């Protein structure tokens, strides 16, 4: 293999040539990665990295199911407004963490960042268990959110760049849908730990937050063997390392190197200048940026507004005690997980544009319908939960597709930051405002007021469906470099 100082045109690893006087590499690594069959390597990568969504599901569910315990805690004694504020602090941390860590992920590499972000999450969620008042609780939730937000950018980027093209849609949807496995874990944990015959209220909620820290330690060990993204390495001046990793992946898949894989020429660079990032996001790719923003904002408001406050709806409107709320999240979580699993393959076969439009539109219509049944008071706690289960069967696939869209329709050099920007803006618009707004609506005690909030969420989803139908990119089964040409690519 040629070293970085080899003469122009020398070989820089199997399937690529490096012209180091101009720092140009001709490589077939992206095409080789996309041509692979699914293997144990891909399963291990998806498991070790995708577990981030399980952690987020655990955290968000605990925030919801523990709300009653936090109100009853002799130490904290939170109001509904306090709970809404703390939920918004978590989301605000996720927004800022996504932007900061997203920029670092594109600059320093995927692997470094998914250890840094996981470490922050571990420390912050453990610290949450030691909270002594609203300020400390909100601060630790903010830091936990920052770790999770950073995880989203680093992990989404890595998975997109490692998974073969024909599996990308379904894999991404299932990984995002695994959020709800974490939600189920959180619900069951809350059922056990909030049982006052077993533990006091003030001890139970603290132990619940330690579950995330323990799970995070296991994940940390699982990630130690995962390599850096070969795509990132090639562009950032490490073609030899990229070639070696690609060869190892092919060997683990027991698949010979593709003999006629398409090659692309890339001008290697240490980093992408910020002006080029901004120019690409809001110049060359401004239409895709608009689509990403609309999809992310709509699903964030729809999801976070309802999910962060569902426990309050059950306790305040249906009289469910806080120690029984966890049982109601289980069918809700099942619908949310099954949606991406059962609908996910259609995003690769029928196509992104049709399926994103359908899932967003159906979600909006179903929420409006179930909201009407809520306002006329014909639902019980059980039928309300079943209605949410049906609504979010489609909404979960829609939300997962929003992450899929922003992670595959922008160039490799800005992929993590693009995910971060649209996650941050979308969550800032839809997620931070949503829980606080719905918390205030629930505090009014008026079904009519809460129904207006549901209608707002439904309207946002229908608007997003219209935008998707008009502007979504047909990225199904296509290589990432064909969906969005790398900024470093030359003819």
Where are the model-predicted features located?
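Transmembrane-helix signature of 12-pass secondary carriers
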Residues: 2-491
